[in-house]
Amino acid sequence: MPENIAFLTNSTDLGHVGRALGSSARPAWAIAVLASVLIFTTVVDVLGNLLVIISVFRNRKLRNAGNVFVVSLAFADLVVAFYPYPLVLYAIFHDGWSLGETQCKISGFLMGLSVIGSVFNITGIAINRYCYICHSFAYGRLYSFRNTLLLVALIWALTVLAILPNFFVGSLSYDPRVYSCTFTQTASSSYTVVVVVVHFLVPIAVVTFCYLRIWVLVIQVRRKVKSEERSRVRPSDLRNFVTMFVVFVLFAICWAPLNLIGLVVAINPEVMAPRVPEWLFVVSYFMAYFNSCLNAIIYGLLNRNFRKEYVRIMTAVWIPRRFVTETSRAATDGMRSKPSPAINNNE
């Protein structure tokens, strides 16, 4: 009980700080824009990623071992939409945090779970693409349905382990500038550097290596005259690769500013933190938030099977009987089909 009272007092202080630093200085239109962006992000996040998961479940062409990574990534994006984002909206509308320490810690934990889970799943997808295109002979053995489930389980186990140190470092707290309980970059300079390197730079390096190797192979194959070399990379495989490459690029663009700010602040928190313009910090955070709703849109724009399934699902919503019938038929069709790579057989 005393801890809750102390936290509420601190939260009140933070609320005053937030009003001093930004909330009172921000015009009503700025707050309305932030709320509108987050509402849009949350709605599209929920609807889009549910469409992804249902599409994989319903469509035999999408239902394969490799697409487990895609579903896992969709789940990571859904985590923030169901809990942290609504609490951020609550803080925006109430100009501060009044939900207590427990809610703050849970929100910060789930935010981290979603972010790191997304990074690790995107890395897993890149490695999957690399193995399928560059090491196709070993792919079937490496990515059996059982092995894929184990790899996804490993990804989430590593994600949880990566978040746990935050509770010991004390880096999860309410930041009034972004109305969110989140990772505090000024809690520990060394820990901030480790977080940026391990949770962002290393995965980005791994994904970049995988996709560069794929691009090199694609270029080499296109220059070959032999038919057997050209057939190694089918047009559908290339389109699928481009889809996931776009997902990666958008993730990197949305999260790079915030991670760069973290590295700059870590150099000397007391000196550098006040020099970071508040508008830049807020924009970088909301760019990161916005990324959670983009993947489902990319699948729909660049992938014909996902696009068709989206239309079928949205149409069937108006005819519930048809939806139930088609879903039941899909659930019993092709469940034991040969495992294939992420978004394989899609156009």
Curated annotation (Swiss-Prot):
Entry keywords, A to Z: Biological rhythms, Cell membrane, Disulfide bond, G-protein coupled receptor, Glycoprotein, Membrane, Receptor, Transducer, Transmembrane, Transmembrane helix
Cytoplasmic side: 58-72, 127-148, 213-244, 300-347
Induction: By cocaine, which increases the levels of day-time expression.
InterPro entries: GPCR_Rhodpsn (IPR000276), GPCR_Rhodpsn_7TM (IPR017452), Mel_1A/1B_rcpt (IPR002278), Melatonin_rcpt (IPR000025)
Disulfide bridge partners, by residue number: C104-C181
Keyword Transmembrane helix: yes
Glycan attachment positions: N10
GO molecular function: G protein-coupled receptor activity; melatonin receptor activity
Transmembrane stretches, start-end: 37-57, 73-93, 106-126, 149-169, 192-212, 245-265, 279-299
Principal cellular location given in the protein's record: membrane
GO biological-process terms attached to the record: G protein-coupled receptor signaling pathway; rhythmic process
GO CC, alphabetical: plasma membrane
Function, in words: High affinity receptor for melatonin. The activity of this receptor is mediated by pertussis toxin sensitive G proteins that inhibits adenylate cyclase activity.
Protein family membership: Belongs to the G-protein coupled receptor 1 family.
Name this polypeptide is given: Melatonin receptor type 1B-B
Taxonomic source organism: Danio rerio
Gene from which the chain derives: mtnr1bb
